[in-house]
């Protein structure tokens, strides 16, 4: 490990005066300007900034960056260091793959910097890259105009907090194979394909926590049928908590869970989603979706894909309202409030204003052990529909209030064909369904 004497000797040979180095060692912080960084210099200052970072790490003192814009790229951090920027301190991306790259390190703090990728347009770059890093804190930073990703983290443990990320060509924050990352209180806007992604290379424990983020205007430039266009996307990552986020105007889902286990989605505000607002799909198990407010979407909440192993969920205390007649982005999506298929409880939800079905229970034979009770379903074309197709499993529909249905209140269906328009009256014809105590107004 480099000690102070080695650092001073090495940097002195790089034409830095000993007085500058001695002053840096004597202060409680290292000033980047002492290493030649100058906001008036419009050229590349990467080598100067790298020396300042290395000096701060070796001296175990914070690095202070004054206000101004500095063009740098591929700055590497491999040991503990704190970098703090004054208001207006901006790192503009030069030629390279990233502005800062943390790798194989721990105890790193990046605080108060602006990362600007405007000069990297046309290159698929990352503003901040974090790989195999523990106890990392990124806070109070701005990330602007990335040609690729704002923050790309692989095997990171730590926090990304109170940052603003906007005009990102791909995804604002992409965390892969995390070790308990916390993404808290960030503001994310105008991203090409995703807001926050928490993914894993293989299914397994992740433990990330996403809380209090504001996400808006997420497009799906790369296309597809759900892998892009989501505010929050969790893929193969287990034990993730998503709560109290405000998510508006996503091309596909506000929150999309794919092949996850034991995920909690609670207390989120989801508005104007172009497809299913909250989607738990493809081999998931153990999803809790509760106390969310959905206003405007092509469909509300989906806990489906039993054919691919999707099962075991609770959907409770949500409000779903004001759905669209069709999806602007996925022609296969039909409007429904809540869709559920296997090993699930749907209870205490309020659904209003669906130009389709309020609650859809099962699809063809893909239905098993579903409880639907104590819900309020208002002003939907059809209130509740349950599958009675050959092979469909059991469902209990009880104590719901279905009010103001445009066509039918509670129906039985085989795939998309209604075989009973009045299921409470015809319930004895279908052995897989129990219907009791519902109020139809």
Specify the residue positions occupied by each region the protein language model found.
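Extracellular beta-strand-rich solenoid/capping regions of secreted or surface-exposed proteins
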Residues: 50-58, 70-84, 91-136, 148-156, ...
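C-terminal segment of N-terminal export signals and the immediately downstream linker at the start
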Residues: 1, 21-34
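N-terminal secretory signal peptides and thylakoid transit peptides that target proteins
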Residues: 1-15
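Residue-level signal for alpha-helix termini/capping positions
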Residues: 54-58, 143, 247
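Acidic Gly/Asp/Thr-rich repetitive segments characteristic of extracellular carbohydrate-active
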Residues: 32-66, 71
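Surface-exposed loop/turn motifs in large extracellular/passenger domains
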Residues: 101-111, 128-139, 156-159, 179-182, ...
């Amino acid at each position: 490990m480099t000690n102070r004497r080695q650092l001073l000797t090495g940097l002195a040979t790089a034409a830095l005066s000993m007085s500058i180095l001695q002053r840096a060692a004597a202060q409680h912080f290292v000033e980047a300007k002492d290493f030649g960084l100058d906001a008036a210099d419009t050229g590349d200052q990467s080598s100067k900034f790298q020396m300042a970072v290395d000096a701060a790490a070796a001296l175990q003192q914070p690095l202070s960056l004054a206000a101004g814009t500095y063009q740098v790229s591929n700055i590497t951090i491999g040991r503990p260091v704190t970098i703090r920027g004054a208001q207006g301190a901006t790192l503009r991306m030069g030629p390279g793959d990233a502005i800062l790259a943390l790798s194989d390190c721990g105890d790193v703090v990046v605080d108060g910097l602006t990362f600007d990728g405007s000069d990297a347009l046309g290159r698929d770059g990352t503003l901040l890259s974090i790989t195999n890093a523990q106890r990392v804190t990124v806070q109070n930073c701005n990330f602007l105009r990335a040609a690729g990703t704002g923050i790309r983290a692989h095997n990171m443990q730590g926090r990304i907090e109170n940052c603003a990320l906007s005009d990102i060509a791909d995804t604002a924050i992409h965390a892969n194979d995390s070790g308990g990352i916390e993404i808290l209180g960030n503001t994310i806007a105008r991203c090409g394909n995703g807001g926050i992604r928490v993914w894993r290379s293989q299914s397994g424990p992740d433990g990330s926590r996403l809380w209090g983020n504001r996400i808006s205007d997420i497009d799906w430039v790369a296309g597809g049928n759900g892998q892009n266009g989501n505010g929050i996307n969790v893929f193969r990552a287990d034990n993730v908590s998503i709560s109290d986020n405000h998510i508006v105007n996503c091309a596909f889902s506000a929150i999309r869970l794919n092949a996850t286990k034991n995920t909690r989605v609670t207390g989120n505000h989801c508005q104007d989603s172009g497809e299913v607002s909250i989607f738990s799909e493809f081999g998931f198990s153990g999803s809790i979706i509760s106390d969310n407010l959905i206003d405007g979407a092509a469909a509300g909440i989906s806990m489906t894909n039993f054919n691919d192993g999707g099962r075991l969920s609770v959907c409770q205390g949500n409000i779903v309202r004001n759905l669209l007649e069709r999806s602007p982005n996925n022609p296969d999506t039909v409007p429904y409030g809540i869709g559920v298929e296997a090993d699930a409880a749907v209870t205490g939800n309020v659904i209003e204003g669906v130009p389709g079905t309020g609650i859809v229970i099962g699809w063809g034979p893909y239905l098993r052990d579903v409880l639907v009770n104590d819900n309020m379903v208002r002003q939907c074309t059809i209130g509740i529909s349950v599958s009675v197709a050959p092979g469909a499993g059991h469902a209990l529909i009880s104590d719901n209030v279905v009010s103001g249905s445009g066509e039918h209140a509670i129906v039985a269906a085989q795939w998309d064909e209604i075989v009973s328009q009045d299921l409470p009256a015809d319930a004895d014809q279908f052995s897989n369904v129990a219907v009791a105590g519902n109020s139809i107004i």
